[in-house]
Amino acid sequence: MSDIHEHKILILDFGSQYTQLIARRIREIGVYCELWAWDVTEAQIREFAPNGIILAGGPESVTADNSPRAPEYVFNAGVPVLGICYGMQTMSEQLGGKVIQGVGEGEFGYAQIEMLAQSALFKDIEDAVNSDGKSLLDVWMSHGDKVSAIPEGFVAVAKTDTCPFAAMSCEEKRFYGVQFHPEVTHTRQGMRMLSHFALDICGCAANWKPSSIIEDAIERLKKQVGDDEVILGLSGGVDSSVVAMLLHRAIGKKLTCVFVDNGLLRLNEAKQVMEMFGDHFGLNIVHIDAENRFLDALKGEADPEAKRKIIGRVFVEIFDEEAKKCVNAKWLAQGTIYPDVIESAGSATGKAHVIKSHHNVGGLPDDMELGLVEPLRELFKDEVRKIGLELGLPYNMLYRHPFPGPGLGVRVLGEVKKEYCDLLRRADAIFIEELHKADLYNKVSQAFTVFLPVRSVGVMGDGRKYDWVVSLRAVETIDFMTAHWAHLPYDFLGRVSNRIINEIDGISRVVYDISGKPPATIEWE
């Protein structure tokens, strides 16, 4: 088996919102990479031994005092370096070039760059040709400052009308700088540029692919846990489901999955989880029906944050009780993924190389004395989904819309009651079913129904009804940081509303949420 970590790229983060996207793109090309904070030491870089280094973007100005700089060793390590946006500016400044503040000449959004010279980074890449026969590329800019003089040994590779050095290179040292963002889809040929850098310039092999990741994970799991028993809290979500499948392949019946049905799941979800993992895949699952326990704990509580804490606390209590019954278990498995590792540093950058394992379950008792198994901690969410498919998990389960950890506990506004949850489950199932039927489900980023604790007058036949209100919510977003409400067709919304009111006794009115984020959040609580 080839070593999937043999060839690797180091990405240094200066705080850009796009930095994780760079890492995901390099992984998509088939090369392993890690994302570290910019203030890494020479010793840490030497130990990691990257085949190439990417200096990512950031919000600071290179011209400001005490702004972040790449470690000097980056330029003496003998490996290719690619500077993106701020990364290009700090590369230029540190190697003897000059950066000036852009006064009213920043570039934000779509731009077209004109190629001035040949470069390995742009080999055979072209979007259009101008009247002078020069190649043009469509790119995405987001910068105020700009390089005004490039370092000795560099050549200008591309320009725009307001940016004389939109790209630069020193082919001898294999140093490259681009003022635009190749990692975003708006830069049409961005993936080809990153592929040239990782595969051709750095000489990496594309070993990072789902089948190899699975093979590597299983081997590492076997080495880590040996013949010991492992317990896992299986929620039916993407991360814990993929962890369950990896461990099942690695250690079989030595894995015990604890599935806690808190009564706050989607319609028939508990049944589906048990049938898929227990009956179909043959995993060893302990099913805990804890609906009454959760609802009793939530009784009388209307505050969203308090509800979240109660749900988390009760889950931990139940999981702890079940874990103690597994007297031979030596390990606790968790679905920690790479963004969790990065974010646990307490900042957007995250020094992933010095982060210790952490409990993402939310405060499991220290006296459990179990080792931690986190087979997904190197992976982004899209990679987890891809290996889930390779492991045989169904597409519809892996690519479902996000569902909050507290479940319906934060989609029933105010106090949570069984009656409300049952009504909401059925209404939500109708909404999702109709989205699938209309081929709209995969065209929105997230869709769900919210139960409003208010009654409204309705008419049914010759009689009046005085029943509950639900709100439909559907949004379109790229990163869930901002979102637009989805402009679903009126006839579709009418069909969903009619079905919910006619088929569910207890709901008299359906409304549609047309709030964006900001100012609203995606979830109501």
Curated annotation (Swiss-Prot):
Enzyme Commission number, as recorded: 6.3.5.2
Active site (catalytic residues): 85 (nucleophile), 181, 183
Source species: Shewanella sp. (strain MR-7)
Glutamine amidotransferase type-1 domain mapped to chain residues: 8-207
Keyword Nucleus on entry: no
UniProt catalytic activity: XMP + L-glutamine + ATP + H2O = GMP + L-glutamate + AMP + diphosphate + 2 H(+)
GO molecular function, one term: ATP binding
Protein name as catalogued: GMP synthase [glutamine-hydrolyzing]
